[in-house]
From Swiss-Prot:
Protein name, entry field: Thymidylate kinase
One biological process term in Gene Ontology: dUDP biosynthetic process
Pfam families for the chain: Thymidylate_kin
Record field: catalytic activity: dTMP + ATP = dTDP + ADP
EC number: 2.7.4.9
This protein's UniProt keywords: ATP-binding, Kinase, Nucleotide biosynthesis, Nucleotide-binding, Transferase
Listed GO CC annotations: cytosol
Gene, per the UniProt record: tmk
Protein family per UniProt: Belongs to the thymidylate kinase family.
Disulfide bonds: none
Binding site for ATP: G10, M11, D12, G13, A14, G15, K16, S17
SUPFAM superfamilies (UniProt xref): P-loop containing nucleoside triphosphate hydrolases
Protein function: Phosphorylation of dTMP to form dTDP in both de novo and salvage pathways of dTTP synthesis.
CDD domains: TMPK
Length: 203
């Protein structure tokens, strides 16, 4: 049986990455093989591209193309082989992030991102996407108190507002796979909701 593909999305500072370990533990507790990965990255080449994408200045279309180049490698080398052998894949970001960050945040025409999506993975979509949502002001405040920011995390509040709107538009357009999670609550409360969703989500 083919595995399931679960993605976690949300703008920087929304808290999504904090819950990956708990999700993996729940799935492994069912006796499933779980592959935990991330974008950009997930492969040796993808991690090199990640460094460029997070820290180097570049044209917005170059950024978009590099994101999808890393994604193509990630799908071919990690995601598809894992799903084919029956493993469940849990990824910190996938293509929804390109619609939010490159289309929404950077202003790349959405039809270009749609064309890349159709070319790079025409038959692959997440089975479940957990979208962690917080007000822009909370995101910015969390980032200011955290580690040294990358180039995305140094962007303006308006940039993050466009990202948030991009994510919410994706969730509204594809409600069958999205679960919207209020990340502006205590960590334990958010984790309980995440784990409840995962326990209800079956193959």
């Amino acid at each position: 049986m083919r595995g399931r593909f679960i993605t976690l999305e949300g703008m920087d500072g929304a808290g999504k990455s904090s819950h990956i370990e708990s999700i993996v533990s729940v799935l492994e507790g069912r006796g499933l093989e779980v592959v935990s990965t991330r974008e950009p990255g997930g492969t040796p080449l993808g991690e090199k591209l990640r460094e460029l994408l997070l820290h180097e200045r570049m044209h917005v279309e170059t950024e978009t193309l590099l994101m999808f180049a890393a994604r193509r490698e990630h799908i071919a080398e990690v995601i598809e082989p894992a799903l084919a052998r029956g493993a469940w894949v849990v990824s910190d970001r996938f293509t929804d992030a390109s619609f939010a960050y490159q289309c929404g945040g950077r202003g790349v025409p959405c039809e270009k991102v749609e064309a890349l999506e159709a070319w790079v993975h025409p038959d692959l979509q997440p089975d479940l996407t957990l979208l962690f949502d917080v007000p822009v002001e909370i995101s910015v405040a969390r980032l200011a108190a955290a580690r040294t920011p990358d180039k995305f995390e140094r962007e303006s509040a308006e940039f993050f507002r466009r990202i948030r709107n991009g994510y919410l538009a994706r969730a509204e357009a594809q409600p069958q796979r999205f679960r919207l999670i209020d990340g502006n609550r205590p960590m334990d409360t958010v984790r309980k909701e995440v784990l409840d969703i995962m326990r209800e989500f079956k193959a």
